[in-house]
Amino acid sequence: MLFRSVTGVDSSPEMIAMCRETFPDGDWRVADMRSPSLEQQFGGVIAWDSFFHLNHDDQRRMFAVFREHTAPGGALMFTSGPAHGEAIGAFRGEPLYHASLDGAEYRALFDAHGFDVVAHVVEDPACGGRTVWLAKLR
């Protein structure tokens, strides 16, 4: 394994079951990412293909959650859309909501919550066209 320990949160019991099966040594919790109540900080926080399913206001509020759960000097990585907006996609034939703020607002939120942006790649071909943010807590 490339990590010492991992804690994962998802609101879907099915997704958590898949994680438990694949990585049985992980700490997997069914919870809402907006209020996970983990009561600990981590060296890295990743919200890959998850954060952008929250509406704009919830995304803004998430920066306090990210800050609460990131240890000093720790990293935060998440994916977003390439620009401000909302869209409805599909997953397994069901509609799936997506939203993103614009880059300037994300940068302001990072700064206001004590993070410095380390990298930002819009529609990264190496990541399947995802827009990726990486920041470090000051």
What does each of the following model-derived ranges do?
Residues G81-Y97:
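Short, glycine-/aromatic-enriched active-site segment of Class I SAM-dependent methyltransferases
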Residues G73-S80:
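Conserved beta-strand signature within the Rossmann-like core of class I S-adenosyl-L-methionine
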Residues F3-S35:
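Class I SAM-dependent methyltransferase SAM/SAH-binding core
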Residues H53-L54:
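A short His-aromatic
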Residues H113-G114, V122-R138:
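Core SAM-dependent methyltransferase catalytic element
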Residues R60-P72:
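A short glycine-rich, Lys/Arg-flanked "PGG" loop and its adjoining helix->strand segment in the class I
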Residues H98-H113:
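Short alpha-helix
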Residues I46-A47:
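A conserved beta-strand element that flanks and buttresses the S-adenosyl-L-methionine
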